Amino acid sequence: MCGIIGYVGADEVVPVILDGLRRLEYRGYDSAGMAVLAPDTIQILRAEGKLRNLEQLAYHHPLHGTTGVGHTRWATHGAPTEANAHPQIDTNGEIAVVHNGILENYASLRRELLDDGVELSSDTDTELIAQLLGREDGPLGDRVIKILPRLVGQYAVVAVSRSEPDTVVAFRQGPPLVVGLGTGENIVASDVTAILHRTRNVIYLQNGEIAVVRADRVELLRVDGTTVDRSPETLDWDAGRVEKGGYRHFMLKEIFEQPDAIRNTVLAYLDQDRQGVNLDGLGFSSEELARLRRVHLVACGTSWHACLVGKFVIEELTGLPTEVDYASEYRYREPLIGEDVLVVGVTQSGETADTLAAMEMAGAGGALLATVCNVRGSSAWRLATSHMLTPVSYTH
């Protein structure tokens, strides 16, 4: 998954972008880049390989401005080269775009643009978004609304326009984006780890939403142009949760934190006298729980491994047959779903795309939805009726 950061405010944007990208390095990447708005132009720096290569480039070719976007890329469409790194720009240098996801109609859009005489400079699907935006008129937010019906796939996009040097526009369908609300500044990122050191007030974008972000305000829009009214959330995390805390890397930190992580998770659901488990706040009625006949656990990666253990515990304690599915396969095996099934999505971030898709399908089939996750307010959190928050350090 790519890392995305966008900033508009009073500070020089290059240090903000580089710091945000460092905090997103755990995602893995093969190139990095940034776009900085200057009077009547967009300044672009891109580099193959590690983030330090981009840092060196920025040192030798300093950029100045207070609005910009940055990106770490894991190649999907196009080889991991400088030309395919993000940001991608349109032919006229009007629009710069960073993108996480995959456009499924990439081939048809590319052919259409080539047939119209557009000269493409990369092999990426991201450039197609920039070119489509560049062919529209009006403010950047309006341009986004015009092209959204043409985008098929999963995407999180942050864009800037040289005509609007005080604006960053973000939109998503699938991969997560979060807006951080500061004082005289606002930030967009693919993960709160990139912004938590600057603000704890955030708005999580939902699928199909557009955020028009300026230094003094954020406007949320639907795809039809109507306004979304949503109050920000205040994260109660200790900023140290997303730092290495003196460890050489996050993996080592997480290993040493496991005893406390298990203890804190268990204590959160014990009665005050520690003689029993209190699940009163899980959100299901007694009638809903009484009619359950099966449990489905859906997850990916190491969350799936945890579900394999959870299956034995659930069956032992409840007597309910419990199935464990890799979330990416769950949608394709036609599982038996109904009101007597509890589907639990297990996802650390609450944003794992396949797990979310499995939960959405199960909910549409009438199943009860629960989630075990680490991020209050995440997509999985909002999908589920019942939530079990793991009160542990932020994991990578």
Give each language-model segment a name.
Residues T395-H396:
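Conserved small/polar residues in nucleotide/adenosyl-binding loops
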Residues I129, R331-T347, A353-D354, G363:
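N-terminal small/polar loop signature for handling phosphorylated ligands or for N-terminal nucleophile
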Residues G20-L24, Q173-P176, Y204, G310-E316, ...:
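Short, solvent-exposed amphipathic alpha-helical segments in soluble enzyme
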Residues M1-H249, K253, E257, R263-H296:
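Conserved short alpha-helical segments that host acidic/polar catalytic motifs at enzyme active sites
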Residues S303-V309, E351-A358, A380:
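Short glycine/serine/threonine-rich phosphate/pyrophosphate-binding segments
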Residues L128, V152-G153, I195, G281, ...:
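Short acidic loop-to-helix transition motifs that present clustered carboxylates
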Residues R376-A384:
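Glycine-rich, charge-decorated loop segments at or immediately adjacent to ligand/cofactor-binding or catalytic sites
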Residues P176, R263, L267-Y269, D273-G276, ...:
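Anionic-ligand anchoring segments at beta-strand to alpha-helix junctions in alpha/beta enzyme folds, i.e.
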